[in-house]
Amino acid sequence: MDVSILRDVRPPVTSYAPNIWADTFSNISLDEEVQKKYAETIEALKQVVRGMLMAAATPIKQMIFIDTLERLGLAYHFETEIEHKLQKIYDDNVCGDDCDLFTTALRFRLLRQHRHHVSCDVFDKFLYEEGKFKGDAEGLLSLYEASHVRFHNEKILEEAERFTRQELSCWIKLQSPLKDKVKRALERPLHREVPILYARHFISIYEKDESMDEHLLKLAKFNFNFLQNLYKKELYDLSRWWNKFDLKTKLPYIRDRLAEAYLWGVGYHFEPQYSYVRKGVVLSIKIIGILDDTYDNYATVNEAQLFTEILDRWSMDEIDRLPDYMKIVLHFVMSAYEEYERDAKIVYGKKFASPYFKETIQQLARGYNQELKWVMEKQMPPFKDYLKNSEITSCIYIMFASIIPGLKSFTQEAIDWIKNEPNFAVKAGLIGRYWDDIGSHKRESKGGEMLTVMDCYMKQYSVSIQETISEFAKAVEDSWKEVNEGWVYTISMSKEITVQFLNYSRMCDASYNRNNGDGYTDPSFAKSNITALFVDPIII
């Protein structure tokens, strides 16, 4: 068929499930007095818990306490004290030849998660034959968790992950105090957990723990409910902002997913001081979603090309050249950008952020436009060419740009760094891209009518869909090793900046990595997480 004919063909339109939350978050009423009492109780309990942390007598007790604080979502209250304790544990080389497997693995994981350089050679003494490790149940679980902060070429940790996964899989069938921890760890290792989602889960586990401390549990519960009320207020404000555009009526082909977008914001930074980070993420995801659905689900190749060119010129002067639905899209993109520009310049004093945010929007549109041409003209490229374009359509750069105003340590130097496409960022983006390609294959193939990247891979390498999924999953594992290395070794940038790539990777894992689903498209997929974080408080 003549390719020029295909350029005016509209793709088969997917009808997405409606927004299941309706007006849940736009009709919220918050009691400020309750929030004030929560804050007062938290401050009092923090003093008690800080005393407990400082009084922990041995390095082992300190590490266990720090690990518990992090699991409960409380570590941000004691960041300075925790960093000081871990620095001393690192400097003193705690866990020489005397520590058991549990303690050795805990130290290794905590130090790597806090960007310390530690060698995996510490596990050599626990390897009693090829690929097998000696240790009790808690020790093997601790080793399993430690194995997921591994780098490339750390063979002993590859063996540890395989061995402990096999051993732990047998334990979930047994009645054991560790059963709940093991089951959750096998679903998603701790290092890949979204911190606030895991905290919500772990509070109920900690409550049943024989070693549970009442003050710590009480602080965790009050802290979570305080955060939840804050999230509800932010969701209320964002709902009112989103609803004023009424795009779900004007553009019926798009996914109406505000709560799901906000879930990503909380995944990036759940702490109260990062309110703008959450807003910025929502802003970027709404731009991403509308552009993605327009290019992928409605526009013809010729319409998309015109839109991309006009967006590249960043001018409303040519808007009348666009079809009516694209005028609405352009108006929204410009309006969202102006909101960002105002916040960046006036509220946060980061005028330098706006040009880069604009650049990432244009860059993303070009990436989507290229994908549309490949699909509609039925000329999928070699997989490596698709993968290069995927660095852009992973949305890692636009989402990174969107949070700049909310990060105190962010400077022009950080923008220059990210523009050089560091491997750390590229690999984080590919984690999202691979999981998205797996999760969205069924939707994007339009019942087999349209080509997807998985079709491209299957054809090029003559493999089945299951083999393709397996290869993509392996690529995710390799990318995680790069992300771990980037997290530890990218010391030229502050932790506040680099943690964004780690948390992006975690959110991708949570959004796409279960049953090959797509947590943004299918509202039922994210429902339990949204309910747990934004609807149901913890009973105190």
Swiss-Prot record:
Mg(2+) 2 binds at D292, D296. Mg(2+) 3 binds at D436, S440, E444. Keywords: Lyase, Magnesium, Metal-binding. It catalyses: (2E,6E)-farnesyl diphosphate = (+)-gamma-cadinene + diphosphate. Pathway: Secondary metabolite biosynthesis; terpenoid biosynthesis. InterPro entries: Isoprenoid_synthase_dom_sf, Terpene_cyclase-like_1_C, Terpene_cyclase_plant_C1, Terpene_synth_N, Terpene_synth_N_sf, Terpene_synthase-like, Terpene_synthase_metal-bd, Terpenoid_cyclase/PrenylTrfase. The keyword Cell inner membrane does not apply. One of its GO terms (molecular function) is magnesium ion binding. It holds the Pfam family Terpene_synth. Its cofactor is Mg(2+); Mn(2+). A motif (DDXXD motif) lies at residues 292-296. Its EC number is 4.2.3.92. It is an enzyme of class 4 (lyase). The keyword Metal-binding applies. It comes from the Eukaryota. Transmembrane segments: none annotated. One of its GO terms (biological process) is diterpenoid biosynthetic process. Sesquiterpene synthase that catalyzes the cyclization of trans,trans-farnesyl diphosphate (FPP) to gamma cadinene. Belongs to the terpene synthase family. The Asp-Asp-Xaa-Xaa-Asp/Glu (DDXXD/E) motif is important for the catalytic activity, presumably through binding to Mg(2+). This is Gamma-cadinene synthase. It comes from Ocimum basilicum (Sweet basil). The gene is CDS.
